[in-house]
Amino acid sequence: MQFFGRLVNTLSSVTNLFSNPFRVKEVSLADYASSERVREEGQLILLQNASNRTWDCVLVSPRNPQSGFRLFQLESEADALVNFQQYSSQLPPFYESSVQVLHVEVLQHLTDLIRNHPSWTVTHLAVELGIRECFHHSRIISCANSTENEEGCTPLHLACRKGDSEILVELVQYCHAQMDVTDNKGETAFHYAVQGDNPQVLQLLGKNASAGLNQVNNQGLTPLHLACQMGKQEMVRVLLLCNARCNIMGPGGFPIHTAMKFSQKGCAEMIISMDSNQIHSKDPRYGASPLHWAKNAEMARMLLKRGCDVDSTSASGNTALHVAVTRNRFDCVMVLLTYGANAGARGEHGNTPLHLAMSKDNMEMVKALIVFGAEVDTPNDFGETPAFIASKISKLITRKALLTLLKTVGADYHFPFIQGVSTEQSSAAGPHPFFSLDRTQPPTISLNNLELQDLMPVSRARKPAFILSSMRDEKRSHDHLLCLDGGGVKGLVIIQLLIAIEKASGVATKDLFDWVAGTSTGGILALAILHSKSMAYMRGVYFRMKDEVFRGSRPYESGPLEEFLKREFGEHTKMTDVKKPKVMLTGTLSDRQPAELHLFRNYDAPEAVREPRCTPNINLKPPTQPADQLVWRAARSSGAAPTYFRPNGRFLDGGLLANNPTLDAMTEIHEYNQDMIRKGQGNKVKKLSIVVSLGTGKSPQVPVTCVDVFRPSNPWELAKTVFGAKELGKMVVDCCTDPDGRAVDRARAWCEMVGIQYFRLNPQLGSDIMLDEVSDAVLVNALWETEVYIYEHREEFQKLVQLLLSP
């Protein structure tokens, strides 16, 4: 019996599920001939159905009095009377103005709206119903600006949120709806349109001048603020075309600050394109520029490309770099540094970004700041150095590594003495902005068991321990040669070495050398030296360039690289436009067999007196003369690394024949001097006295298991042969392009034989870095290892600088 009881209950529930008392149904009035008419209003009749014991509401069709629509069928008389009263007051304007209403589906929608939104006026209902003819009814027109509902919104608000442009036109043209009326949240129709999905609605609203376009809601947001917050790029575009103001202050600043806060790049770009001054606007709360609000590298890069001041300060004195470090945003930090942010800028309480980084336990960020010039012993307003901050905040393991690093410059871990305030007074003055720990001396730290021992010497290497104040003698009697290896993005290592030489000598690289030779990336840097570009600038350029050039898979598109070279050196600049120092770039002429080394020069080539190694071929086109050679094409030709980029015409990467151009440069100088003597200009010849060769870092040596290539007799031998062929191919390429080893030995021996000072500077890297490496962390670590190398070879650097500065 219990089973049958549960079955009956289940069937009853299912029946109730499908029996909706408010389901609209088309009926014949003849079916109600025996029913009593309880109420009657216009075309609506409330009938008591005796057979079903229900109260039915029937809408008599104006077109056919014999038929109608049952709007509900209720068992409670009280409920029936309430609903009948509601229907009778709301339905007449609809069936009186449009025959489209007289359909079951439309009536169902309309009656559901009436029940679900009892506070809505007939005009609100008409908007949701979406039948245009209804808006010509006098009663619907009369309620066009009504706010009598739970949200306090007008029918125009609903039309905008719905995105119905046709209904919007009806409301504005026939019903004279006002566009500046606000709802309970202070929002106008423009706010609602922004939250919709139809930009055309916003465009139609903007055709008529209205204060609602720039009205702030209860949260202080204009429609433009709201569009930026929601990332509605097209809405932002339409608002700006409708002359929405960009300079209205919201709770978080101008709309540009809102776009930056929510990382809406497209919206920010729209605003800046309309009003470029917005890029410098300051928010009211922090006095911060849009760059301070950048939360990722993409947003920061977008602003910086458009000329945003990278070192702009907030009301507290902090730069965007301070904020990025505080938020531990390494990608943002790298973008700011590569666009020239001052790594040593003093912000609130005199803190530099390095002070703030010490509390983040992010070694990569600390390395990046130091590599880009942050001083490790700069005290803040409380006299605290980064070392002191590290000793009080950082986690144990990282703290040990950081203190090991900073101890090498004699950083004081005690709370320092501030002029006019004793240590005890300053300690009792109150909590420090960073922490409120005791100012006691931390325990002595042993340097024997600390992690990251290689970090120890870096900071000291950056100190001007061997800076010499003497300047170059312009009438130097000997020539200096600088040779730069190839190596792709590892050219950053060369840049870091040159920065160290410039810092130690106090003289620009261009003024230290008379000859500069470069291959591939070294060729680009040679041209940068020729055109007086600072190495600090080139370091940032390289970090930015890699993301533009190394996109997709190899071989990479040549377009981005060529555009980069044109942008840096000019599209029409010729090699001979700048005469000093003399520069040569290596390239490989690949339109002949065997291939030949070609030098792109900014001077006339010496006349050859030796017999050519091959019989001249009249079918081969001669190289372009220096006076006609475009600088960017020379750089592109020298850097056309096979499998990385397609050849530049007939030129391949110079690294195929001279990845270390030292011997080729010395040969060129000798031939140039001999040519000068033959021409009777021997008085202009200067003896070469110093050769400086800079590498892009030595990869660690690893064992190779097999380079055997043979005809296999079984699957196992086939796999072994394939692996051996791969290793052999890699070895052949490495041998052809090896800038170290015997190439360095030969150059050093030659220099020693003729009495030339030879310096080979090439740091050992901890890992093999590819030519197209794009990871900021990997490249920063390579520069860090370069800084370690600089310190370890500081005596060699000191000797080099002394020789370079001597007459």
Curated annotation (Swiss-Prot):
Motif (DGA/G): 653-655
Short sequence motif named GXSXG, residue ranges: 518-522
Motif annotated as GXGXXG, chain positions: 486-491
Catalysed conversion reaction: a 1,2-diacyl-sn-glycero-3-phosphocholine + H2O = a 1-acyl-sn-glycero-3-phosphocholine + a fatty acid + H(+); a 1-O-alkyl-2-acyl-sn-glycero-3-phosphocholine + H2O = a 1-O-alkyl-sn-glycero-3-phosphocholine + a fatty acid + H(+); 1,2-dihexadecanoyl-sn-glycero-3-phosphocholine + H2O = 1-hexadecanoyl-sn-glycero-3-phosphocholine + hexadecanoate + H(+); 1-hexadecanoyl-2-(9Z-octadecenoyl)-sn-glycero-3-phosphocholine + H2O = 1-hexadecanoyl-sn-glycero-3-phosphocholine + (9Z)-octadecenoate + H(+)
Enzyme Commission numbers on file: 3.1.1.4, 3.1.1.5, 3.1.2.2
Modified residues annotated as Phosphoserine in this record: 13
InterPro entries: Acyl_Trfase/lysoPLipase, Ankyrin_rpt, Ankyrin_rpt-contain_sf, PLPL9, PNPLA_dom
Gene3D superfamilies membership: Ankyrin repeat-containing domain, Cytosolic phospholipase A2 catalytic domain
Protein known as: 85/88 kDa calcium-independent phospholipase A2
Membrane-spanning residues: 481-501, 512-532
Region described as Calmodulin-binding (IQ motif): 749-760
Gene assigned in the entry: Pla2g6
Claim: Hydrolase is one of the keywords in the record: yes
Active-site positions on this chain: 520 (nucleophile), 653 (proton acceptor)
Species whose genome carries this gene: Rattus norvegicus
Domain PNPLA: 482-666
Activity regulation text: Activated by ATP. Inhibited by calcium-activated calmodulin. Inhibited by bromoenol lactone (BEL).
